């Protein structure tokens, strides 16, 4: 069982957590535990205890993983790292977005009077981020010279790769980027009163060019984001 000072770090794919796992192995001993088909790797980054896990793609996988981190490992905060598509013309491939909050852009019960994105029964449409953890990521980005943006992250079980879908999400939520896990992680953290932060490196423009850009820049963006997380976590000690 980890302590409340431990940070859970979630990536959806191997490429998003590979550098983190390598760094942990270089820092010292690691311990791996399997739950629900996921491998939870306990170790340290710098002097901070962490649990790193690949959750798999999508909202259900992300939510399941987050709840396991909180319930079984007792983490005190959760940091989601990975890649995303840009929804803002000023945010380029290779830039980083540190979330201010996160929304589920697929949720739509508007026919029953709810705002688009609002889950019936939920006390908020957008799930807030922990400012201390988010600022640590921003500060690390400034120190290593990464172009960083703050703003809303939109999540849903859909790879956004068309101008029409991009415009729909931007118009409804004024989000900076889109991906497939962050809002689910933030939702679980919100319900559990667990601090949360999301950082995403841009791999594509979430438009008609995404099918070309994403395979080209996926690994580069994921590595870039993981480096930033290592710097941020190391600064917390």
Regions found by a protein language model. Name each.
Residues 4-28:
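Short, conserved "active-site rim" segments that organize catalytic pockets and cofactor/ligand binding
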